[in-house]
From Swiss-Prot:
One of its GO terms (biological process) is base-excision repair. This is Formamidopyrimidine-DNA glycosylase. The lineage of its organism: Bacteria, Bacillati, Cyanobacteriota, Cyanophyceae, Nostocales. It comes from the Bacteria. It catalyses: Hydrolysis of DNA containing ring-opened 7-methylguanine residues, releasing 2,6-diamino-4-hydroxy-5-(N-methyl)formamidopyrimidine; 2'-deoxyribonucleotide-(2'-deoxyribose 5'-phosphate)-2'-deoxyribonucleotide-DNA = a 3'-end 2'-deoxyribonucleotide-(2,3-dehydro-2,3-deoxyribose 5'-phosphate)-DNA + a 5'-end 5'-phospho-2'-deoxyribonucleoside-DNA + H(+). It comes from Trichormus variabilis (strain ATCC 29413 / PCC 7937). SMART domains: Fapy_DNA_glyco (SM00898), H2TH (SM01232). CDD domains: EcFpg-like_N. Belongs to the FPG family. Binds 1 zinc ion per subunit. InterPro entries: DNA_glyclase/AP_lyase_DNA-bd (IPR015886), DNA_glyclase_Znf_dom_DNA_BS (IPR015887), Formamido-pyr_DNA_Glyclase (IPR020629), FPG_cat (IPR012319), MutM-like_N-ter (IPR035937), Ribosomal_uS13-like_H2TH (IPR010979), Znf_DNA_glyclase/AP_lyase (IPR000214), Znf_FPG/IleRS (IPR010663). A zinc finger (FPG-type) spans 243-277. The gene is mutM. Pfam families: Fapy_DNA_glyco (PF01149), H2TH (PF06831), zf-FPG_IleRS (PF06827). Its cofactor is Zn(2+). PROSITE patterns: FPG_CAT, ZF_FPG_1, ZF_FPG_2.
Amino acid sequence: MPELPEVETVRRGLNQLTLNRKITGGDVLLHRTIAHPFSVGDFLNGITGDSISAWHRRGKYLLASTTSAAWLGVHLRMTGQLLWLNQDEPLHKHTRVRIFFEDQQELRFVDQRTFGQMWWVSSGMAVESVITGLAKLAVDPFSPEFTVEYLANKLHNRRRPIKTALLDQSVVAGLGNIYADEALFKSGVLPETLCTEVQLKQIELLRTAIIQVLETSIEAGGTTFSNFLNVKGVNGNYGGVAWVYNRAGEPCKVCGDVIQRIKLGGRSSHFCRQCQV
């Protein structure tokens, strides 16, 4: 699933390519991709004639503000891709939504697993009232509110493994399996450590590691282990420099011990028993 760095990479690409271009129409090939409004016709009527002022990111959500004061929301979920293409490009078999722009360009939503969603929120409506998941999000790791005190308060009363807690979007918005593993390695904390057992100094290290790992991945254009592509169809490069994620059985880059993998809360967790305690 695309996580914060991948979504941020897409956001930056969209801001470079799509702003202030008139939307001339669209085509919805899979109706359930449109979460709101209920009518696909209303969705297409809403976007047509409008233009995008800016793309924003909240956690793993993409939100486009428009010149009509409306919002276009997108969540990539597991396999979603937003690609900027010429309208005459052959359709990928997993194309779900096409948004046409002037100059024969289009924003194409491709989604193999079909869990991705799009929303059109008309002007005058609160975006959180329609995209209800936004109200449940924690603060962003790049927000000034993401302090050591904030993270400590979120973690200390939870009797569950630290890795599981970090995947909870009400604890840290945008963090997922890849970067939780990477941040825990960088901070020296084992993924199965209970939140109640994590010391304040470890939380300080963890907060710093989360920010550093996310920044490094954004600079690398995100991570591509399966489906992620940026808006130009290019893979992310963070996987080549990952410390532990997807490296089970390989030597630790710090101590040389073997990277291990366990299942924790139904998700794979990668770590080094020597570097993490």
